[in-house]
Structure formats: structure tokens, C-alpha cells
């Protein structure tokens, strides 16, 4: 195994996931605000699942997506 190739591959994958995920979330929020489905001040629980079938890896990461700083004046 080439550690450098492995590490570069992981970084490229995670960068792609991060950029693509952010874009999807931004579009979903914009669409929901436009449709008046949300007010734009919510906090949403979020979960990301990482799976690599060949390694029998399944890891879940829980967090939240906030649309506004708590207690901020509007």
C-alpha cells in the first residue's frame, strides 16, 4: 500500500463530499425558503453516513445545520 496515494485519495474524496454536500444543503434550504416551507431561522438535525462496502465500513456522523445564530436579533 502506498500511504501517499491512499491519503491523497481520501482527501480528494472528502473534499468532493464536502463541496457537494454543502451545495445540496444550500439548494434545499433556498428551495424551502422560497416555498415558505421554513422561515429561515430553524436548526435541523443532520446525519451523514459513510459507507465503504468493500471494507465493511459504515459510520454515521450526527450534527446539526443552523440557519441562524441562536439569540441573534433579526
Model-predicted regions and their roles:
Residues 14-17:
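Acidic, low-complexity intrinsically disordered segments
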Residues 4-11, 27-30, 39-74:
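N-terminal intrinsically disordered, cationic/polar leader segments
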Residues 19-27, 31:
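Compact soluble domain cores
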Amino acid at each position: 500500500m502506498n500511504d501517499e496515494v491512499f491519503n491523497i485519495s481520501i482527501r480528494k474524496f472528502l473534499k468532493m463530499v464536502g463541496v457537494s454536500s454543502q451545495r445540496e444543503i444550500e439548494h434545499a434550504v433556498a428551495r424551502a425558503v422560497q416555498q415558505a416551507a421554513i422561515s429561515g431561522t430553524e436548526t435541523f438535525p443532520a446525519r451523514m453516513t459513510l459507507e465503504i462496502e468493500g471494507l465493511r465500513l459504515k459510520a454515521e456522523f450526527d450534527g446539526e445545520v443552523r440557519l441562524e445564530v441562536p439569540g441573534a436579533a433579526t
